[in-house]
Curated annotation (Swiss-Prot):
The gene is arg2. It is found in: Mitochondrion. Keywords: Acyltransferase, Amino-acid biosynthesis, Mitochondrion, Transferase, Transit peptide. N-acetylglutamate synthase involved in arginine biosynthesis. InterPro entries: GlcNAc_Synth_fun, Vertebrate-like_GNAT_dom. Its EC number is 2.3.1.1. PANTHER family: AMINO-ACID ACETYLTRANSFERASE, MITOCHONDRIAL (PTHR23342:SF4), N-ACETYLGLUTAMATE SYNTHASE (PTHR23342). Residues 367-388 have a biased composition (Polar residues). The lineage of its organism: Eukaryota, Fungi, Dikarya, Ascomycota, Pezizomycotina. This is Amino-acid acetyltransferase, mitochondrial. Gene3D superfamilies: 3.40.630.30. GO terms for biological process: L-arginine biosynthetic process; ornithine biosynthetic process. It catalyses: L-glutamate + acetyl-CoA = N-acetyl-L-glutamate + CoA + H(+).
Amino acid sequence: MSSRVLASRAAQPLKRHPTVVGAGDEAYPTPRRCFSSLHDRTVNQSADFSSTSKNYDRLGRRAKEKLLDREFFMSLLNSASTKREAKSYLARLKAQQPAKPQKKLQSTTVQQTIAESLPSGVNLGSFYGASRSVYQSPVFRQDSTPAPAREDIPERLHLALVKIKTPQLLDDSTLDGVARTLSQINRLGLACCVVVDPGSDGDTHTLRKIATEQVGRIATAVDRQPDSKSSHLYSVLSFPAKRPDIPTVSSRKQLLSPLRDGHILIVAPIAYTEDTPKALMVPANDAVLALTKELAGLATMPDPDEDPMITAQKINDLQKEVSLDRVILLDPLGGVPAFRGPQTSHAFINMDQEFEHIERELLQVRNPANNSQGESVVTNPISDSNAVSESASTEPTSTPAKQALLPMSVGEDTIDGHLDNLRLSQQTLAMLPSASSGIITSPVEVANSARSLESSPSELSVGTRRQRNPLIHNLLTDKPLLSSSLPLSRRARGSLHLPAPPTTFVKRGMPVSLIPDPRVQVWTAQTRPNMNLDDPHVDLPRLVHLIEDSFNRKLDVKDYLNRVNGRLAGLIIAGEYEGGAILTWELPPGVEDDGSESSTARMVPYLDKFAVLKRSQGAGGVADIVFNAMVRTCFPNGVCWRSRKDNPVNKWYFERSLGSWKLADTNWTMFWTTPDLPEKPQKFRDYEAVCRSIQPSWAEDTGVID
């Protein structure tokens, strides 16, 4: 049935006409040609025929399938930042599909041998050929015996572990939206294992009853979704006799079988004792940790008498079976709030860098009496595990008015809930590969963004775009909804289509090294470090590789070292040289570097190189980590840099800078984060002069006009 027929019927009432019945479809009246505006056709088609509308049952089977596909791909495209990201994910998903084995290869060998022995072009049947028994009889050969065909190795299962807290407090509409999102995630190739968290209000019997009821309720909501099936388990966890206080997974096969069959698995936090079977309630967080340990392949108890190499191989084989890619915490509290600094929430948390700082911040809000009266800044150690440097990220405390409101507006239970989510995310990601990530958001946020096209505005109507689904967006992009390096003014909720409550994207992350350590020596023109890029603390070959890989150009290392050595302000290195920044102090042309106060005052903080490895670009938050360290810790009073006018990264720079200026008669655009720079004419001219005068240090001419 064509969309024109649907649109015409929805646009205006029609008189009865003879009906035309097609195979597999219902009977529909054949309408006369009638015309309506394109706007009316679009709106009514979306409203009258959606998977949740009353008219949905009137559609034929093929029409229903097309409509469901349309809703699925519309949700897919709206959840990605760009169509390129959605296309990229679909390409990765297609690449994961194994090639079909050639089952008929062996059976065709005999037929091919017979055919080759016969005269070409003539089918003489079996009369002139040898009998089948001759071809199939054993033959003595000195050739090596072909190895038997190896059974197909099961495809690696990509999995998301989801915890839903207090689903009994969610209405049916919200739960249906969550189930719709889980169904879409499952369709995108990420199997879902859901753990029900009934909370802690009530005795053991009451909580067990609530958990059992909610498992069935969630299963019903999942089964209502098109092409979606659920399975639920009540006995997958157990308490071993040796460790009666720590739950473990009793059967790995029982856990993985429904997931491999494409079912959404729902687990109740109930464990059974091994010695005398008895059902006991388990804290949902402990259940999540037990499942994570099993799915990560770390639950195997090594035999002391077994060869360590054999034990390692067993663990490796288990890890090849399953890839736990996401740990999703759906909590009515939403993401992790921020009580210090200008931001109100954490869009992205780099656990290696920020966990202890955020945990301490939440504890200070929970117990304000324990805070020191004279505290005015919060110290954020950039990398406790890095031997080269540790940085103190100093952010101003919140305003007195904000501090006064915190104890009244935020209760201890709320802070405890956020602490539990933060710690659970840290503990689970610590057991998983660095590529895995976590999401902390609210069920309401997921349900609202998963609404059907029925409630969506017309594509032609005036308004903001549909709200992105945080779970699908993260699956497609491996990035948070809002970049953590965006200025606060560009992260504020200006419309109803930004997340509220916030969503927090969590990665195990990477350490960040700042050289020199700003906590020991602040980066100022008066305290320039006496260091060069060939300093022992700097791995120069890896730094050069980072720059060349990021810019896709060969660096003239000797010329570059001659230019920046003696001018260095410092270096920012993320992880194992996955990203970094080189910052210098530059003097405008004509100003003599004589060490005087007037000369030092004219020095410009300049971002000379900002680089991220290609494999880390666009995902993982490496660029955000480096940029945040630069503007919040190293140069909080401002820094400038330049970029080619046609650089595709300029959009990213525009969003994060406080201003930009196209340099006339050049191919450069100048950016800065210095507050009120246009109101300071001398400093502005110095910034412009520096950006104009610096000469590139590339080894060959690639045709790029600098």
